[in-house]
Amino acid sequence: RVEFDDRQRQFVVTTSNKVFHARHVSIGIGKKIKLPDCVTAQSDRCFHASEMMLRNPDLTGKRVAIVGGGQSGADLFLNIFKGEWGQPEQLDWISRRNNYNALDEAAFANEYFTPDYVESFYSLDSAAKRHMLAEQKMTSDGITSESLLAIYRAMYHRFDVLREKLWVRLLPSRSLTAVKHTLDNAYQLETRHHLDHGEEAFKADVVIFATGYQSATPEFLEPLAHRLL
């Protein structure tokens, strides 16, 4: 259990056999996978990207859908496009973002991760913190320029130089609203478009969620819940 003593201005950490007092507490319990709200279970054909190498699926002749427009989604897209797990029949890449955005690698972006900036950040009020976190999102959630260029070049070569029939769909600006089983043992992915609010459905034999991770607040931090962002 972790509490904060306002009078002493320090944390009180209670364990099964000892009590510690500290000015700072570092929590290193990791994160858990993040899945869309409409996804309640995983299977061999519908799973989080973190399990890709464990499941090692055969995608030959399959309709494949990737959900998630960040770096892991880009890495998956490029490797599947190149036939790492066999040549798929179709490859869809669905993202909530309006574009496949580049990682913010500007010269001063790394200043956000320096001790001085962190100290000044924690002196802000909650509203300012939320605003700054949203503004800085692409410093961690974007796609490297190298990955985007590799995807562009690979697609250009296959579809514009070699003139292959288009078997890839880039589908930004869409939120996944439902994943349903179909009678032909496939999945139907239902989405809502952010710009025109239209509803669309896409079929896939294999669905991979490159939707990242989320922090799980442990029970022992419950006394500090009102202090956490």
For each feature predicted by the language model, list its residue ranges.
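Flavin (primarily FAD) cofactor-binding/catalytic cores of flavoenzymes
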Residues: 1-71, 75-229
